[in-house]
C-alpha cells in the first residue's frame, strides 16, 4: 500500500445519490479515501446551494482524481462546472458511464 491512500472526489447529480453512495462504498472498501458531495434530506436555499457548490470545488482541490457518477451518460449543469474546474486544475477525471 502506498504511503497515502488515493483520494477520490465523487461528483454527480443529486438525482443519483444512491449510485454515488454505492461508488463511495466500493471505493472505500478498495482502500480509497472518498470525498463526496454533502447530502440534505430537506430542501436547501439558493444560498446554501451556492455555499455547497463552492465547498465541493475545495473538495476537488483535495482529491487526486475525480469520479463522475453519471448513469446513462447524464451530466447536469453543476456537475459540468465541477468537471470543467477539475480539468482546469489538472485533475484526472473518470466517468461511471460513457458521456
Locations of the language-model features?
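Conserved catalytic or regulatory cores that recognize and/or transform ribose-phosphate-containing ligands
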Residues: 1-99
